[in-house]
Design a protein with these regions (language model features):
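Mobile active-site "lid"/loop adjacent to the S-adenosyl-L-methionine
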Residues: 1-16
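Conserved beta-strand signature within the Rossmann-like core of class I S-adenosyl-L-methionine
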Residues: 13, 24-31
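Helix-to-beta-strand junctions that scaffold the AdoMet/dcAdoMet cofactor pocket
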Residues: 18-23
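Short alpha-helix
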Residues: 32-46
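Short Asp/Glu-rich motifs
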Residues: 40, 62-63
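Conserved S-adenosyl-L-methionine
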Residues: 48-58
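SAM/dcSAM-binding transferase cores
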Residues: 63-108
């Protein structure tokens, strides 16, 4: 379901997520900050409960993405919002970023 814009509209993507998601399942979507309202509206229209799970920053001041948490029920939606910062003030990767990607990259 990655790169939905190539094949599916936001509305169609939410319909597919709803159809494929188990009643106790979780879906996490990495979305642009500019698309958040569209995703939240589309999720609500198909009956998915949603919560912004994580805000992703390129650096300490530049918000670039959100991780949206979707479920069929709202019982297990986490109420806290996490922050994830890729680069620090020295433009070096943060420990958080390195730790998250260490299994995928050899030299960070």
């Amino acid at each position: 379901m990655a790169l939905h814009q190539s094949h599916l509209s936001v509305d169609e993507l939410m319909q597919v997520v709803f159809f494929m998601l188990r009643s106790n399942g979780d879906a996490y979507l990495l979305i642009s900050i500019y698309e958040e309202e569209n995703f939240i509206k589309a999720a609500s229209l198909v009956g998915l409960k949603n919560k912004r799970y994580q805000a992703i920053y390129d650096n300490e001041r530049k918000l670039i993405r959100y991780v949206l948490h979707l479920r069929k029920d709202s019982i297990h939606l986490d109420t806290r919002e996490e922050t994830f910062i890729i680069r620090d003030s020295k433009n070096e990767y943060t420990e958080q970023f390195v730790d998250a990607l260490k299994d995928f990259y050899l030299h960070l």
